[in-house]
Amino acid sequence: MAAKIKKGDTVVVLTGRDAGRSGEVIQVLPKDGKAFVRGVNLVKKHQKQTQNAEGGIISKEAAIQLSNLAFQDVNGKPTRVGFRILEDGRKVRFAKTTGDQIDG
């Protein structure tokens, strides 16, 4: 299945503790159906001291289900993503609310 949410997209969280917050997708895990979003779903991790890094408690992003994310259109609202095939044969994503093309 084609990816509706890709690395670098700006998304809005639909449900959960961070509902309504938006951020940029850092990484997508298609096999798990999850993604990492910058500044969303932060968890505290207890880091052990190493030669390179200090020990302590750090905040980092945890994975969030793709079903809880929606692409953010140019108006800043969540939208569904569809696919169109252009005249030259390329398959591109578009925002269903505005009809604007997302890719190339």
UniProtKB/Swiss-Prot annotation:
GO terms for cellular component: ribonucleoprotein complex; ribosome. InterPro entries: KOW, Rib_uL2_dom2, Ribosomal_uL24, Ribosomal_uL24_CS, Ribosomal_uL24_KOW, Translation_prot_SH3-like_sf. Keywords: Ribonucleoprotein, Ribosomal protein, RNA-binding, rRNA-binding. It holds the Pfam family KOW. Gene3D superfamilies: 2.30.30.30. The keyword Signal does not apply. One of its GO terms (biological process) is translation. Coiled coil: none annotated. GO terms for molecular function: rRNA binding; structural constituent of ribosome. Part of the 50S ribosomal subunit. NCBIfam families: rplX_bact. One of two assembly initiator proteins, it binds directly to the 5'-end of the 23S rRNA, where it nucleates assembly of the 50S subunit. One of the proteins that surrounds the polypeptide exit tunnel on the outside of the subunit. PANTHER family: MITOCHONDRIAL RIBOSOMAL PROTEIN L24 (PTHR12903). Belongs to the universal ribosomal protein uL24 family. This is Large ribosomal subunit protein uL24.
